[in-house]
Amino acid sequence: MRYWYLRLAVFLGALAVPAWWLYQAWIFALGPDPGKTLVDRLGLGALVLLLLTLAMTPLQKLSGWPGWIAVRRQLGLWCFTYVLLHLSAYYVFILGLDWGQLGIELSKRPYIIVGMLGFVCLFLLAITSNRFAMRKLGSRWKKLHRLVYLILGLGLLHMLWVVRADLEEWTLYAVVGASLMLLRLPSIARRLPRLRTRHGVS
């Protein structure tokens, strides 16, 4: 397997972060409401992983190194895993294992609906992130996986609705996300390899 060391580093890093958070919760180091802190951190971790996933293609075009693409799918699947953990923590710590509370939560916090829409889209990408699905779907596979851009928008909207007045951190993620989208515009994406060539010549 090519770039096994890079894949291993991603695996260990993505696994270590939630494990550390759980340990912090165990020793009561997450403040007065550790459950909510876990929910928030897992959601933010999923957004960071989504941004990292989207950054792999521009990085490959700029550097010419295929290792970035080698871990792109892995990062995307870890993003989905973090979202699953985010939802699980929400069910345990916010709903108290009571689905009956979900209706009340939805009426008070409609941003949950936005988050669920993002989860459904991400689920579709996760179950089709394999060669079998690529062969079966053919040209439709790429069209389906463009949902990642919608997922980013939903994720940022979900976070914006959650943080409300505290916009400083959200703005940082929004700027990074918007920059990654700009790098995918055909007129800009075509120039990225040229930048690498010019840098190599100079």
Swiss-Prot record:
Q: Which organism is it from?
A: Pseudomonas aeruginosa (strain ATCC 15692 / DSM 22644 / CIP 104116 / JCM 14847 / LMG 12228 / 1C / PRS 101 / PAO1)
Location in the cell reads: Cell inner membrane
- Membrane-crossing segments per the record: 8-28, 42-62, 75-95, 110-130, 147-167, 169-189
Q: Which GO terms describe its molecular function?
A: electron transfer activity; FMN binding; heme binding; metal ion binding; oxidoreductase activity, acting on diphenols and related substances as donors
Q: Primary place of residence?
A: membrane
**Gene name in the database record:** msrQ
Q: Which family does it belong to?
A: Belongs to the MsrQ family.
Could you identify this protein by its name? Protein-methionine-sulfoxide reductase heme-binding subunit MsrQ
Q: How does it assemble?
A: Heterodimer of a catalytic subunit (MsrP) and a heme-binding subunit (MsrQ).
**How many cofactors are bound and how?**
Binds 1 FMN per subunit.
Which top-level group of life is the source organism from? Bacteria
Query: Membrane topology for this entry?
Result: Multi-pass membrane protein
Cysteine disulfide links: none
